[in-house]
Structures are given as C-alpha cells and as structure tokens.
Amino acid sequence: MNYPQEKIKPYSNDGKKSEQVEQMFDNIAPAYDQLNHTLSLGIDRSWRRKAINWLKPFRPQQIMDVATGTGDFAILACHELQPEQLIGTDISEGMMNVGREKVKKEGLSEKISFAREDCTSLSFADNRFDAITVAFGIRNFEDLDKGLSEMYRVLKTGGHLVILELTTPDRFPMKQMFTIYSKIVIPTLGKLLSKDNSAYSYLPQTIKAFPQGEVMKNVISRVGFSQVQFRRLTFGICTLYTATK
C-alpha cells in the first residue's frame, strides 16, 4: 500500500526519500540529542523505558535497534535487558558516529555495534533476532510495508517487535495544543539549534501523515505479525506498538 508520509520528503519532491532522509540526519546529527530532549521536554526518556520494560519478561539475547540514530535507545536497552548482542542499524553514518562515541563512553563497545542498513532491504539472515526495536524512525521509511516485512523476516519465530512513534493527540485540548506546538515551536527551535531549515518542518508533517492507532495496528498485522497491541502515551503524543512473530 501507499501511505501519505512516504510521499513527504525533507528537501525536494524529486529524488529518493531515503537519500534525502540520510542527508537530513547527517546534517542535524551534532544537534540531534539536544533537540530531541528539548522538544520532548525530556519525556522521550520515559517513553523509551516503557518500551524496554515491555521486553524484559522475554529476555531477548539478540536485538536489532532499527533507525538507531545516536544510540539512545540501544544504550538504555543494553543496560536494562543485558543482551548478548545488540546491533543498531541506520542509514545515517553521521547519526551512528555520534552513537559510536556514546557507546564507547558507556563502555558498551563489546555488546553494541552499528551497521549502515536500509530497513527495506536488510542484509541479515532470516530468523536472526529475538527482538527488534524502532524508536521514532519508522515514519521515515521510504516503504513502510517493505520495512515491516523485512523486520518480520529477520525476527525469530516467537520473537518480539516494539515500535515507539510520535503521534497526533485526538482529544481536546491536547490536539489543539500539539497542533500549535508542531507547527510553530518545533520548526522554530529546530532551525535555531540544528541550522537545517527543512528538517524540523519535515518532521511534524510526517507525524501528522503517518498511520496511527488502529490503522497502524492493522498495517503491522497485515505483514504477518500477531498479538499486535498499541498504547497511547502522554495524552497521545507518543504511541507504543508491540507485536509477536
């Protein structure tokens, strides 16, 4: 299927979305962590912790963190879940280079590694991972169905998928407040701190366009996942999706 956010690109209507997303994240990588925590008022840390807590009972030993960015989720997951191996994948080397430095400082280089991967065409073997996580990156996929299908392929039978994604609140007054915040505050702060005039206009557009709630639950189910559930966090600003292969 085609989804509205797949047509939204950071810089130009011409060219591949994945290449423009890679360029965008390479550009904003140095300022990304500061911006992320500032724009979410630090609440993003609690969202990550909720996602990781859901995985704890399953004790996954081989984990892939898709769209790993600067490695925040990977580092927290490694501390909390104590896996044998965690591979962070992303299309942006700029983001992963920041992540590599953070992992080194945490003393986790033997457990966490990074690999440049396009999630619509992963290089890993079938049934490779016990768990796959995606935090705030799935709406940037050039092809959502392909990305989910590839994650399904490399996940072991009985393995678990966890997705965190920013969503649009659907109730008054948070819906109205979030609209103002995403249209004015996010682009203004983004331009100021990242020096990229397009990135933080693109991101709110993709949040609004991305399928959410029951619609996203059905998208995940269609590629083969079972026991698909979702939970809205912080008045619907973020949604946690969980599924099993």
Curated annotation (Swiss-Prot):
Keywords per UniProt: Menaquinone biosynthesis, Methyltransferase, S-adenosyl-L-methionine, Transferase
Pfam families: Ubie_methyltran
Reactions catalysed: a 2-demethylmenaquinol + S-adenosyl-L-methionine = a menaquinol + S-adenosyl-L-homocysteine + H(+)
Entry annotated with the keyword Ribonucleoprotein: no
Enzyme type, top EC level: transferase
Catalytic activity, EC: 2.1.1.163
Lineage top rank: taxon: Bacteria
One Gene Ontology molecular-function label: demethylmenaquinone methyltransferase activity
Record bears the keyword DNA damage: no
Pathway, per record: Quinol/quinone metabolism; menaquinone biosynthesis; menaquinol from 1,4-dihydroxy-2-naphthoate: step 2/2
SUPFAM superfamilies to which the protein is assigned, alphabetical: S-adenosyl-L-methionine-dependent methyltransferases
UniProt family annotation: Belongs to the class I-like SAM-binding methyltransferase superfamily. MenG/UbiE family.
Reported function: Methyltransferase required for the conversion of demethylmenaquinol (DMKH2) to menaquinol (MKH2).
Classification via NCBIfam families: MenG_MenH_UbiE, PRK00216.1-5
Name of protein: Demethylmenaquinone methyltransferase
